Amino acid sequence: MTEEEIRQLAADYMGYFTRGAAAQDRQFKAVEMLWRLCRDDAGTGFRVIWVAVNLVDADNMKALSFLGTGPLGDLINFHGQDVTGLLIEAARENANFCVALSCVGRSMVSEGAWKDLTGALPSIRAHHSGLNS
């Protein structure tokens, strides 16, 4: 996928959740396409999620939680500990990503991946909170 296609998919995915009942076929397809990317192409799936996280206002907890319970959970479910290091680094770099990653549910991921997340996220959240004080 080109960077433009990644940006468009991220915008369409977020549009599915921000437009509600007004979502169009394009937004519905974006949800399925991102699920497939998370399953089949972890690198591109991550890029789309990264772009989507950066489209969201920091106070939009609903949108960030959709990213965590949706594609981030899918990415970890399909690729486990192969991607947790990358995701933890992204959470360190970006407070929105940290919030979204914190929304991944225990039942969605393997024991090893959950251990990685719960070991790293508390200190990352504390770091981001300290920056905002």
Question: Which positions does each model-derived feature cover?
Answer:
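Short, charged, intrinsically disordered terminal tails
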Residues: 112-133
